[in-house]
């Protein structure tokens, strides 16, 4: 199925307030569970996976925040084997891309959420997840959700973890473990467009005073500082995902009343503008920061391939949310106990109005792990681990 662009940008405030109202009415009380991977991979395993980002890789940090952005209610996590199907705060039906990558690279456990009460001692050695639903590169991003962890805060939290590693291993061993045996994964940027620059009501002032190029420039300057701070804390192996085709998610297609084979042109154009400049930034950092490897993950093309040729990968739908309500694509109300739920969860590219299903995450993760330079460069993640 070919996907054509639409210049539509009809975003109704009524839809926005409906989403907020529904989120406020959700009362979730299921505690996160399931840290173990039960990994049987032999030798050469990843030491620690440090995961930064937004709801695409949040493993439960938002469970511990007073926020409108939460996923610790059923049927989220229904296919997450480590918890027996109990919701953990992941915004999908099963594993995130971060989970799958860590598992495939031989990590002993899933990276533990930084805010979890048991995130201490030896539990940190498999890695820590700092990602937060609603978080972005810019501090103002996601304020509609009340609370979230932006990238600046996430880096601050890693600074705390870094000191804990010194206490656990001693300074010399800790530095070696973090620099040589760990991977730093950053999946962020989509919210800076969806829940900042493009968000109705909140973004009017920003869009009036800043051109898209200026806003993207600010994003990249902030990201440069954040990545440099991690480098100064001994991070050396990085993978940074670009922004996916955010104009094609069920939420955007629904609120803009698009046909099945249309996407919101403006959102995708902004993502592509950012992505081109992100790749240049990573190339620059590879030259400027000795001993570092910044890997660029071309998530945009990977996801667009699934959306455009979904049937080739065994999917039945790349437009409708498996779990959600409202509109043609179930794209208005987030996944929760009262949501409509599809019967074949592994046949949908999108789990909810915003996030991929585990089936889609597996395909994307495998490409990042073993794919060629078209999707992951200059090396894939299996090679990055062994460097």
Swiss-Prot record:
EC number(s) given by UniProt: 3.1.1.-
Signal peptide region: 1-32
InterPro entries: GDSL, GDSL_Est/Lipase, SGNH_hydro_sf, SGNH_plant_lipase-like
SUPFAM superfamilies in the record: SGNH hydrolase
The keyword Metal-binding is annotated on this UniProt entry: no
Family label: Belongs to the 'GDSL' lipolytic enzyme family.
Identification of the protein by name: GDSL esterase/lipase At2g23540
């Amino acid at each position: 199925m070919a996907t054509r662009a639409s210049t539509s940008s009809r975003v109704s405030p009524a839809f926005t307030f409906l989403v907020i109202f529904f989120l406020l009415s959700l009362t979730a009380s299921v505690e996160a569970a399931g840290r173990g991977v039960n990994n049987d991979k032999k030798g050469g395993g990843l030491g620690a996976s440090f995961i930064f980002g937004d709801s695409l890789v949040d493993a439960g940090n938002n469970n511990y925040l007073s926020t409108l952005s939460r996923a610790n209610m059923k049927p989220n996590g229904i296919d997450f084997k480590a918890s027996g199907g109990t919701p953990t705060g992941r915004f999908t039906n099963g594993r995130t891309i971060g989970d799958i990558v860590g598992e495939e690279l031989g990590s002993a456990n899933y990276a533990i959420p930084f805010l979890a009460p048991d995130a201490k001692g030896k539990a940190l050695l498999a890695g820590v997840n700092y990602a937060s639903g609603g978080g972005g590169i810019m501090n103002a991003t996601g304020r509609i959700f009340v609370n979230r962890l932006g990238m600046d805060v996430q880096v601050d939290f890693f600074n705390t973890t870094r000191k804990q590693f010194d206490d656990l291993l001693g300074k010399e061993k800790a530095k070696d473990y973090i620099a040589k045996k760990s991977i730093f994964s950053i999946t962020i940027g989509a919210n800076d467009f969806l829940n900042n620059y493009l968000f109705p009501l909140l973004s009017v002032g920003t869009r009036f005073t800043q051109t898209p190029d200026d806003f993207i420039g600010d994003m990249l300057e902030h990201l440069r500082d954040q990545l440099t701070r991690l480098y100064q804390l001994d991070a050396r192996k990085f993978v940074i995902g670009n922004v996916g085709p955010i104009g094609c998610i069920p939420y955007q297609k629904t609120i803009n009343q698009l046909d099945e084979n249309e996407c919101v042109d403006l959102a995708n154009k902004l993502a592509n503008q950012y992505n081109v400049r992100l790749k240049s930034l990573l190339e620059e950092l590879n030259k400027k920061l000795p001993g570092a490897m910044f890997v660029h993950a071309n998530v945009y093309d990977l996801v667009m391939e699934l959306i455009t040729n979904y049937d080739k990968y065994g999917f039945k739908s790349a437009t409708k949310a498996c779990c959600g309500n409202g509109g043609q694509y179930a794209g208005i109300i987030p996944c929760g106990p009262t949501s409509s739920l599809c019967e074949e969860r592994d046949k949908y590219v999108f789990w909810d109005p915003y996030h991929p299903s585990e089936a889609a995450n597996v395909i994307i993760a495998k490409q990042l792990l073993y794919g060629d330079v078209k999707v992951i460069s200059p090396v894939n993640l299996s090679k990055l681990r062994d460097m």
